[in-house]
Amino acid sequence: MINKSFSQTIVVPENQTAIFLGSGILPVFATPAMIALMENTAMKVLSDLPEGKTSVGISMNTNHLKACLVGEKIHCKATILSFEGRKYTFHVIATNENGDIIGEGTHERVIVDVEKFMSKLK
């Protein structure tokens, strides 16, 4: 499982800018949107879990290093660094079309039983 990875590419839409999401006043790819992309990419690494199981994010430690405009392509990759029991740690990285790193960090996810998890919230 270590080094298993998933990659995906998006084109920055208007609704993922800092001004749209309220995290800033500029029309650039928002930090919350970058983090959501990283989390989604890591989730997809674990897409082959048994029925009734899913992973939930529990930790994100990332740096947003470079701004991107609407219409730019962003490539995101998540790779399993380690796992212990139900907890998986990922390296996450996002780059622009020139290969410049726009964000990088680590993310942790835990495998849960969907039914048990949701029943605790009622």
Label the model's feature ranges:
Residues 70, 80-122:
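HotDog/MaoC-like acyl-thioester-processing domains
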Residues 9-13, 63, 108-110:
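Generic structural detector for well-ordered beta-strands
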Residues 43-75:
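Hydrophobic beta-strand-centered segment that forms part of the acyl-chain substrate-binding groove
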Residues 6-8, 56-60, 72-76, 86-88, ...:
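A generic structural signal for short beta-strands and their flanking turns/coil linkers
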Residues 36-40, 44:
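Short, residue-level hotspots on alpha-helical faces of the histone-fold
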Residues 31-35:
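Conserved N-terminal beta-strand and adjoining loop/helix that marks the start
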Residues 1-29:
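Catalytic strand-loop segment that frames the active site of acyl-thioester-processing enzymes
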